[in-house]
Regions:
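Active-site helical microenvironments for divalent-metal-assisted chemistry
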Residues: 1-169
Length: 169
């Protein structure tokens, strides 16, 4: 499937930002631009893995990773950070392992995706206990790579922007 037909197929489902459309159209000529190639490959992988999944709003799930990656790009994120934005839910929501992420996208992307996944995993009985653990994990993630926190914040920001689709609890 050519990059242009990929865009045509996907545009029926979700609006692709201009920067991503340009990346996909130029995909064949990206061999010399490893940063753009990494971003396009991460998008394609996330798209395949999230195909058929929907958000509570009913929109295709891939709209969320696109929004997260777009936020990261607007903040000046590097290609590794933007790729992690596309892939941040892949380990949590599919059968893909961190090892497969590393094999396909490198150790830096794996570490960011794993860091974001670990920030989401714990459940606690008390609010105080939960808040203390959240701060502890956030500080540990910042000590390792601040980009983990930036990806997680972009994820949360997009989730907050789409809260109207959740049931009030």
């Amino acid at each position: 499937m050519t990059a242009i037909s990929i865009i045509e197929n996907r545009s029926n489902e979700v609006q692709l930002p201009q920067w991503l459309q340009e990346c996909l159209i130029d995909q064949e000529s990206l061999e010399s631009d490893s940063d753009a190639l990494l971003i396009c490959q991460a998008f394609n992988f996330a798209y395949q893995l999230h195909e058929g999944q929907t958000r509570k709003s009913g929109e295709p799930y891939i709209a969320h990773p696109i929004a997260v990656a777009s936020l990261l790009r607007s903040l000046g994120g590097d290609s590794v950070t933007i790729a992690a934005g596309f892939l941040h839910d892949v380990v949590e929501d599919t059968d893909v392992t961190p090892e497969e992420i590393e094999e396909r996208f490198g150790v830096q992307v794996r570490l960011l995706v794993e860091g974001v996944t670990k920030l989401s995993k714990f459940n606690f009985s008390s609010t105080t206990e939960r808040q203390a653990e959240n701060f502890r994990r956030m500080f540990l993630a910042m000590a390792t790579d601040i980009r983990v926190i930036v990806v997680k914040l972009a994820d949360r920001l997009h989730n907050m922007r789409t809260l109207e689709h959740l049931k009030p609890e």
